[in-house]
Amino acid sequence: MEKRGQKRRQPTAHLSCELCRERKVKCDKLDPCTNCASAGVVCIPVRRPRLPRGAHVQRMRRISPEDPEASIQVDVPSSAGAGAGIAVVDDLKERIRRLESLVDSMRSPTSQISNLDQQSRDIIELTPNELDDDSSSTHNQATIHLGDGSLRVLGLSGPSGLDVGWTSIIKDKDISIQLCQVYLLNVDPVIKILHRPSVERWMLQGERYLGFSERHSAVDALGAAICYAAATSLTETQSWARFHATKSSIVSRARRACEAALEKSNLLVSPEVTTLQAFVLYLVARRSEDPSRAVWTLMAFAVRIAKALDLPGGADETFFSQQMRKRLWLTICLLDFQTSLSRPSEPLISVAEATSSFAPPKHINDSDFGPKSSHDISDREGLTDTTFSMVSYHVQAAGRLLNFESSSTDKEILQQHVQQFEQKTLRLLFYCDPESTPYAWFTWHRIQCFVTGARLSAIRPLRHQHRGSTGHLMPSLDTNGSASTLSLALNILEKVQLVHTDPRGEGFRWFVTVPWQPLAVAISECYVCQDKTLIQRALPIVEAAFQQHKAAVSGTSKAISTTLERLMCHVREKLSPTLCTSISLTASPAFEIANIPSTLSVPHTPPSRSSITSNGDLLSNWPWPAPDLPHNGPDIASATEAAPISTSLQKLDPLLLSLDSQLVIAGQEPLMENDQSWAAWEEVIAGLHDGETTRPNMFLS
């Protein structure tokens, strides 16, 4: 029988789970709860004694030392009077009040950093007589020093504080190893900013990373960023197969852990390139799961930090360090270009700066060099670990010249930019067999998509020219310009659909989304095109791409979404009476993309190399006039002179043989006012830049 004076242990209660508490919704306290089960996320139950409420908070009760549930113990000497006990209580209440005010002010976006630093210093000024060493260390760990470069003031951690449970996904060795393997399969081939062998020795074999000390903040941030990027690249099927959990739960945990590690790494003032690598991976991963403007805003920090670390320079560095710096800088340039297109807005890095600093890394495999490499290594021919990334670097350089260079309004200059881009990128496909590996297949089709995109950008650039501008407008492609432009846009949309339907593209689907520019071109060309056969082929592709874009980027630029929605409504309204017998144009918002692949002309498996030249869907079979044109235009990057690709034609796949001498812009006639195709694109760009245009709308005529 218990003694009368002995305190009874407070029973453990089943409280609201973590997710319901954060979302501030009522939890039924089941295991798992109904809210988490319906949302498809992992339910984290909370079981602990209930905290005192109301008047009970004011009472000082001595907690039994053997009580394992006790989290705070305050001992008042028996010899002390009532006044001493009251003084201790008042002092503790004051510290709690100041700590709560500090937390509330940190959540406010308008808080002052200096005031927070002073408050945090005041709170942790504790004497040994007041709290023991363990309590003091707990306060020090819970204090966030914003003056040291913490990112909580930027809102990376969301509305709630950090939870120790979120970092367990990184500390779990088995999970981190699996996520690293996913990263090496899905992310590393397309975002090449890390040295693959060094990452394998570090995360898979347990060695130190590039000479850093154990538990270095920069290395911890990089490991968390790798796990976060890997989590976002998973498909739902892969997530269940590997982790027996939904993708959303894995991504949420990995993101919290990554943001916590970035806060501890002092990103804003850190001199380590590794910390910036972690932040860039964070931006890449967040951009794939979060269509809001967050990444577009945070890109300014990445660009500033890169310039502060002198990434474009670094001539005195070792060969290994030079390669890593070049990869990181050009990846930042690529992200800057991609985020500027998604809003749309001007890139942070100007065309002149991106061109002058364009120094691509070596086209080699990661196994060809290491941290101890003391000499340069020559470029390799054929497919390497860096082939796709090298093409991406050239894409952002050419894309800036075609879309954001104000002086490039002459058709010959634009033609030269496209030709130089094709020469540089197609050279990287020497001996590439698309049937060898999923990476080779993906690189093969994406490069064709990039070449088509460059040609489309030359014909329909993003530069907005108001009427009355002194610049020369782009001439029509040819007498059947609308059909040719529509074919270019359709090819891009089909290639995107191919990646999302072919099993070999499963690991890279996170990286490929429907680009709004080709989609807008395709919709506007469907409105003005007179070829009914081409329209019948195009509409299912356009409809599927529109629904996929609408579902994937909800929450992104309102101007883009509104413009595409308006264009699609006008096309459906105009073409429904004439094509209702062959295709339905009244698709509901729940349009199923899975029903579309049967109508696409893109094959799900690439043709054999013996029959590849007979495929009518390939770019090499498209009619492109080829009048003579001088090749003395400016280089894309003015960094290295590329040898003419015609000198090595015997090394190219037959698919690419006809691309050497093809021209993008043909026809010498000036643009006529009745060119409905160009007028339609002008209205699209005007709607993006000016909102609702006040000019006469041809889509309403």
Curated annotation (Swiss-Prot):
It is found in: Nucleus. One of its GO terms (molecular function) is zinc ion binding. Coiled coil: none annotated. Keywords: DNA-binding, Metal-binding, Nucleus, Transcription, Transcription regulation, Zinc. GO terms for biological process: DNA-templated transcription. GO terms for cellular component: nucleus. Residues 17-43 bind DNA. CDD domains: fungal_TF_MHR (cd12148), GAL4 (cd00067). It holds the Pfam family Fungal_trans. InterPro entries: Sec_Metabolite_Reg (IPR050613), Transcription_factor_dom_fun (IPR007219), Zn2-C6_fun-type_DNA-bd_sf (IPR036864), Zn2Cys6_DnaBD (IPR001138). Transcription factor that specifically regulates the neosartoricin B biosynthesis gene cluster. PANTHER family: UNCHARACTERIZED TRANSCRIPTIONAL REGULATORY PROTEIN, ZN(II)2CYS6 TRANSCRIPTION FACTOR (EUROFUNG). This is C6 finger domain transcription factor nscR. The gene is nscR.
